[in-house]
Amino acid sequence: MSAQRSAAARVPQWLALLLVCLAGLLLEVGYTRIVSYKLWYYYTYLVIGLSLLGIGSGGIIVAMWAPIRRAATERIIALCSLWGAVSIVAGYLVIARIQIDTVAIWDYGTQASFTNLFALGIICFFVFSTFIALGIIVSTVLGRAREGVGRLYFADLLGAGIGCLLAIPLITRLGPPIVIMVAALIFAVVGLLALPRPAVEPKRSVTRDRVILGLGAVVALALAGVVVAGEDTLPNIRTENGKLNATGSEVLHSEWGPVFRVDVADAGLPNRLLVHDGTFGSGLWPFDGDTSKLSRFETDPRSIPFSVLGDPPERELIIGSAGGQEILAS
């Protein structure tokens, strides 16, 4: 069968491209939140660069590796999608649990510096590698489209756009770990649907395709179970050694948001501590409405703007109330 002639498939190429691009955007945005929580917020830009590098590397593989150029398009979509699903799961498990202290990297020449630089390299590799399959699929489909490239490229952009629209609502509702598993599930489903029908394949490949189909179905079912069951089925993300890493019974509530992961930790009754992405956020102090108990704010730096004004303003705008402390100070 010619590489340019597609075997009969269960899913049209435009739909496969739309779905994998949607999953790719969910994966990328999900990892920006995971890495921001695990490491520090500025490593978010590293995720974006590594994702683009992975997609571009997929295109280089297509250009340089002859077996891919000889393979049927649907087979490439199927195998790369299934491989992508497995690589996403494996990558997440490694990234979530690996121990690292990026601050120690700056102690140049020490064992801690080399050890943590190596750990950062592992994280970078697994983020990068999860996007290679997407790059191979996109490069193969668009590179062979000829006169139909406009329609397929539109599907590519539409899928990416839908992924952008869904990323924040899904992160808020499900959390980034499950969003990453949703991306893996989409890849797995596309892989299963893209496998060519046995009727149009040589007999020697029918058994191989059935094995691939069976393994892919197991992966898809496992991922579906994780997505339905929720984040508790996945290992906890181990944060930087320098972060608070509030876990266990001391955590009273945890919630992922579009900006921070917020944990409410027990700071000794009756106070609570807000933890933003594993770093100190602000304290939560009880207040019963009696302003006579707020004398501590008279020497608090947060009262300086009001001391400068002298007379209390009729209206004021507070940006970032820090657990209500600025409100009480006002």
List PLM regions with ranges.
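Alpha-helical transmembrane segments of multi-pass membrane proteins
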Residues: 1-330
